[in-house]
Design a protein with these regions (language model features):
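Start-transfer (signal-anchor) and selected internal transmembrane alpha helices
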Residues: 1-65, 274-282, 457-468
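Membrane-interface helix-loop-helix junctions at transmembrane boundaries of multi-pass membrane enzymes
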Residues: 261-278, 361-397, 445, 449, ...
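Signature aromatic-anchored transmembrane alpha helix within multi-pass, membrane-resident enzymes
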Residues: 279-283, 426, 432-479
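Extracytoplasmic
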Residues: 460-546
Length: 548
């Protein structure tokens, strides 16, 4: 398999690949000893660990009012969606400790029960955090998950970008934009963990990159890892997985189309490796998901049709001007004030990217137009922005068609922005890396004429300054949108007096009808049994209301 030069946009030169493999502790070469590879792996692990510590400290800062007070009793609020997710994070610990089916419970929507896989139950987050729930309660679990989500998402993007850029700070900046974007902060502030935990998409992209572009590892092993990651994403958020699959198919079409037009022989050489790997991934995913898929579509209390029948399919799209001009989600915040007493300030809408970032991406694409990675992720980012518009437009948009496609019609258009954010993070990291390298080359060439000793050091320093300057132009507008909004506002989750004093003394198996009743949107009563270790069942519940 041939390697494409960096100037042409994908991969690296043979020397670059060897250097990257050595730095990352991967690859095999007769010129590199076992000690060198072990040293490289340790160095790569140290870099990843350091990046995670920084991201985690930033995430703790985001939730400072939680971790500096009482993380077992305070969170965003005990209202609306936070109350909803408190219950669903409490369920895995209860099911595992009582030997019950993780996928189904009659403790909610009693007596029919609730199908966890037809709901945004985030089982894969609740299961590993079950010890936290059992020891400290679901509020601590929610706070732990909400703190880890941005940090782990940023770390996963950092890992992915280290495959594509040479300068580690460029990868760190890309991870920062991905893990702490307005999309992420808004999702995590409202406890939408199925949207805030985005650590798996970069890992999935990395596997696909290995199978289709790099092709240095065994395809069956990489394909199996891809299948496991797809299964994991299904158990975190089926909506995010559906979006990833749709955009993945578009990306595959673009890659194959370009390869077919530019180098058919290379396409033919790569095809067997990619086919084996993707086939292995499909087999592993289907085997692991066979029972969950059956339970989702045919199990007890499953949903069919529109899961949000009160919403017109394709509505809930973004406002185009909010991409470059900061808007604040005052309507959502007002609903939290009315329904649950949320005290926080309005946050930037999830689609906000900032004018500086858009200018950097546009100029970077123009300057390094031979870099095919920029074209690929730029195209995917533009496509997902269009898909985020929704049907409520005076002009034609793709959702006029997608709104009539079964299953796809249940996706909220604005959530395609999660892929836009991924694409933006990748593009920014590549541009920052290329800017540093180009500036360094210019300085090195000029200084080298009169000082061979000073030239490389000066080139490295000035190149780094240029790279950091480009990053600042792109990210400062993003940060200013959050000024005065973080750390996020929190409050104590308070139970009504009866639920605090009398409910814990109820005999096991009792059913409680709460007031207010729990239609979707007034979900505060879901927090009451969650805090009480799901000691009793409740009638009704919040969440999707499709045909049962």
């Amino acid at each position: 398999m041939t390697n494409v030069p960096v100037a042409d946009g994908v991969g690296a030169t043979e020397a670059g690949v060897l250097a990257a493999n050595t730095a990352a502790g991967t690859g095999a070469s007769p010129l590199i000893g076992d000690d060198d590879r072990r040293t490289g792996r340790r160095r790569a692990l140290a870099v990843l660990s350091l990046a995670f510590v920084v991201y985690l400290l930033m995430s703790i800062g985001l939730w400072w009012h939680v971790w500096s007070t009482h993380p077992t009793t305070v969170t965003t609020c005990g209202c609306g969606d936070p109350a909803f997710f408190l219950w669903f994070l409490a369920w895995p610990a209860h099911a595992l400790s009582h030997g019950q089916n993780l996928f189904y419970s009659t403790l909610l929507f009693h007596p029919n029960g609730v199908n966890m896989l037809s709901n945004t139950s985030e089982l894969l987050l609740g299961v590993p955090l079950a010890p936290v729930t059992l020891l400290f309660g679901p509020i601590a679990t929610l706070n732990t998950a909400s703190t880890l989500a941005p940090a782990l998402s940023a770390l996963a993007m950092f890992w992915l970008l280290r495959r594509w850029v040479r300068w580690t700070p460029a990868a760190f900046i890309g991870g920062l934009v991905y893990g702490f974007s307005p999309f992420m902060v808004t999702a995590v502030a409202t406890d939408h963990l199925m949207l805030a935990f985005l650590a798996l998409p970069p890992l999935i992209v990395g596997c696909v990159d290995e199978l289709i572009v790099r092709q240095r590892r065994r395809p069956i092993a990489v394909g199996a890892a891809l299948g496991v990651l797809v299964t994991a994403q299904y158990l975190v958020s089926t909506e995010v997985l559906a979006i990833m699959v749709l955009i993945g198919l578009v990306a595959l079409l673009l890659l194959v189309g370009y390869a077919f037009l530019s180098d058919r022989q290379d396409l033919i050489r790569r095809l067997p490796h990619a086919t084996r790997g993707l086939g292995a991934g499909a087999v592993v995913a289907l085997v692991l998901l066979a029972y969950p898929l059956w339970f989702t579509f045919a199990g007890p209390a499953h949903l069919s049709g529109l899961v949000w029948p009160t919403l017109t399919p394709g509505t809930g799209g973004l406002t185009p001007s909010a991409i470059w001009h900061v808007h604040y989600s005052t309507a959502d915040t007002r609903a939290f004030h009315v329904l649950g007493g949320y005290l926080g300030s309005p946050l930037p809408t999830s689609e906000y990217l900032g004018l500086g970032l858009l200018v950097v991406l546009g100029l970077g694409l123009l300057v390094w137009r031979r870099d095919r990675r920029l074209w690929l992720f730029g195209a995917l980012g533009a496509i997902t922005v269009v898909l985020s518009l929704g049907v409520d437009r005076t002009y034609w948009v793709p959702w006029r068609v997608l709104a009539h496609v079964p299953l796809i019609q249940n996706i909220l258009p604005s959530r395609f922005m999660l892929v836009t954010t991924l694409c933006v993070a990748v593009m920014l990291a590549i541009i920052v890396d290329r800017a540093r390298q180009s500036a360094g080359d210019v300085v090195r060439g000029a200084a080298g004429r009169w000082s061979a000793r000073l030239g490389p050091a000066l080139a490295g320093a000035l190149g780094s300054l240029v790279g950091l300057g480009v990053a600042a132009v792109a990210t400062v507008p993003l940060a200013t949108g959050l000024i005065g909004k973080v750390p996020l506002t929190v409050q104590t989750v308070r139970l009504p007096l009866w639920f605090a004093d009398a409910a814990p003394r109820l005999p096991p198996g009792q059913v409680v009808l709460t007031y207010p009743f729990i239609p979707s949107g007034i979900q505060a009563p879901m927090a009451w049994p969650a805090v009480d270790s799901l000691h009793f069942a409740i009638v009704g519940g919040g969440g999707p209301g499709g045909v049962v």
